[in-house]
Regions:
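Bacterial N-terminal signal peptides that target proteins for export
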Residues: 1-7
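N-terminal signal peptide c-region/cleavage motif recognized by signal peptidases
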Residues: 15-18
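Compact, glycine-rich, soluble single-domain proteins
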Residues: 22-161
Length: 161
C-alpha cells in the first residue's frame, strides 16, 4: 500500500508536465531570406500559450547559425534600437508575435547561405526547461514598393519646388 502514494504523485507530476508542454504552440515560423553575403538574419513566429501559467522563451539555437539571440526593438530617446533581451514573456492564455520591429530571433554568423525555400531547424527553450523543435522555411519578406503606397492627391503636390 505504501507504494501507491508515491506512484500517484509521480503520475500527477507527469500529467502536469504534459499539460504544460501541450499549452505552448508555434505558428507561422519563418526565417528571413537575405543576400548570400549576409551573415545575419532573423526568425519570426507567433508563440501561443494556451495554458494557465505565464511562460517565457529564454533561449534558442539552430545548426544554421553559430549564435541565436532573443532581440527586441525599443524606443531610446525617439530612436528605435535593436537590443538583446534575456526572455520573451508569453502570458497565460495569450499570444506573442516575434515580428519585424518587435521581438524576434536573431541568427548570427550563419553556417552557410540560406536560400528561399530552405528549411531551418529551430530549437526554442522556455523558462521551465521545455524545448520545442520546429522547422521554419526561409522566405523573402516583402517590402512595400512604390506602387503599393497610398498616395492621396494632396500628398503629391510639388508646389514650391
Amino acid at each position: 500500500m505504501s507504494w501507491r502514494l508515491p506512484m500517484v504523485a509521480l503520475l500527477a507530476s507527469l500529467a502536469s508536465s504534459a499539460a504544460l508542454a501541450d499549452s505552448l504552440r508555434v505558428e507561422g515560423a519563418h526565417v528571413r531570406a537575405v543576400p548570400p553575403v549576409s551573415t545575419t538574419t532573423a526568425a519570426f513566429m507567433v508563440l501561443h500559450n494556451e495554458g494557465e501559467a505565464d511562460r517565457s522563451l529564454v533561449a534558442a539555437s539552430t545548426p544554421a547559425a553559430r549564435v541565436a539571440e532573443l532581440h527586441n526593438h525599443v524606443d531610446v530617446d525617439g530612436v528605435m534600437q535593436m537590443r538583446r533581451v534575456e526572455a520573451v514573456p508569453v502570458p497565460a492564455n495569450a499570444s506573442v508575435s516575434l515580428a519585424p520591429g518587435g521581438y524576434h530571433l536573431m541568427l548570427i554568423d550563419l553556417a552557410a547561405p540560406l536560400h528561399e525555400g530552405d528549411e531551418v531547424t529551430l530549437s526554442l527553450t522556455f523558462d521551465d526547461g521545455q524545448t520545442l523543435e520546429l522547422e521554419a522555411p526561409v522566405r523573402r519578406i516583402e517590402t512595400m514598393n512604390h506602387d503599393q503606397m497610398d498616395h492621396q492627391p494632396e500628398d503629391m503636390s510639388h508646389s514650391g519646388h
